[in-house]
Amino acid sequence: MHKEIEESTNLQLDFSKLEKIQNNLKLTEVIPVAVQNSETKEVLLIAYVNKEALDYSIKNRIATFWSTSRNELWVKGKTSGDYLELIEIRVNCEQNSLLYLVKPKKGVCHTQDKDGNTRRTCFYRKINLLKKELKFI
């Protein structure tokens, strides 16, 4: 199912994501974190953090998140080697979301391009506004 979504040009947005998170979380609270390349300012991914993930990120200077699907700490790069060195953390005005400024060590997304390379961002498609279809960029 994930490949159908990740490699498709069909627009299939998951508007129920927050509801799934709410239903899946038992003992933890999370806030969203946008992750941006500190040098290029390119947005790399959107994830969630809880206190444990934030503390781990600060202590180890590696972008770390809370996996809302697995309900566990997600150290980005632990299995792939695609670590994100944490340069700075910013907090929004209402203190209910964060911005991680990072320096990627390799790729970022868990998906790969047609040549088998890890993508540099999870935002590798755009919506054709006329056709409401996705286009790889």
Predicted regions and their residues:
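C-terminal binding/interaction regions
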Residues: H2-V30, N37-L44, V49-I137
